[in-house]
């Protein structure tokens, strides 16, 4: 499945893991990514692939929206510690 993500300034995801690979291709803006506790910046033109079971979060610390195209296998799940597993609507 493929979808667009739009993170407004100040928006963030909770730390989570995935059951399958998830790929992000940044289209505009920038985002701060934490991957297994390591900080990365994702800017327009960058690609990031998050492997299964890696702790991951993304946030927009900038002044402009961050937009990306994401891909994940249909049926892939996200796991938030203490909250359980769910299938993101775009991966259903």
Please describe what each predicted stretch is.
Residues 5, 57-92:
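Double-stranded beta-helix
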Residues 6, 25, 34, 49, ...:
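Conserved beta-strand segments that form the floor/walls of ligand-binding pockets within enzyme
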Residues 14-15, 33-34, 50, 56-63:
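Short beta-strand His + acidic residue motifs that chelate non-heme Fe in jelly-roll/DSBH
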Residues 8, 18-19, 26, 51, ...:
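A short, compositionally biased micro-patch
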Residues 1-15, 20, 73:
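A short glycine-rich, His/Asp/Glu-containing loop-to-beta-strand
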Residues 19-31, 36:
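Glycine- and acidic-residue-biased ligand/ion/polar-headgroup-sensing regions
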Residues 37-53:
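Short acidic-glycine-tyrosine-enriched beta hairpin
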């Amino acid at each position: 499945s493929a979808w667009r993500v739009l993170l407004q300034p100040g928006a963030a995801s909770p730390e989570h893991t995935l059951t399958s690979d998830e790929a992000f291709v940044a289209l505009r803006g920038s985002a701060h990514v934490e991957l297994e506790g390591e900080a990365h910046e994702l800017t327009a033109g960058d690609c990031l692939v998050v492997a299964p079971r890696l702790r991951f979060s993304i946030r927009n610390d900038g002044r402009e929206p961050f937009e990306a195209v994401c891909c994940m296998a249909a049926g892939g799940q996200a796991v938030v510690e203490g909250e359980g597993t769910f299938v993101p609507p775009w991966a259903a």
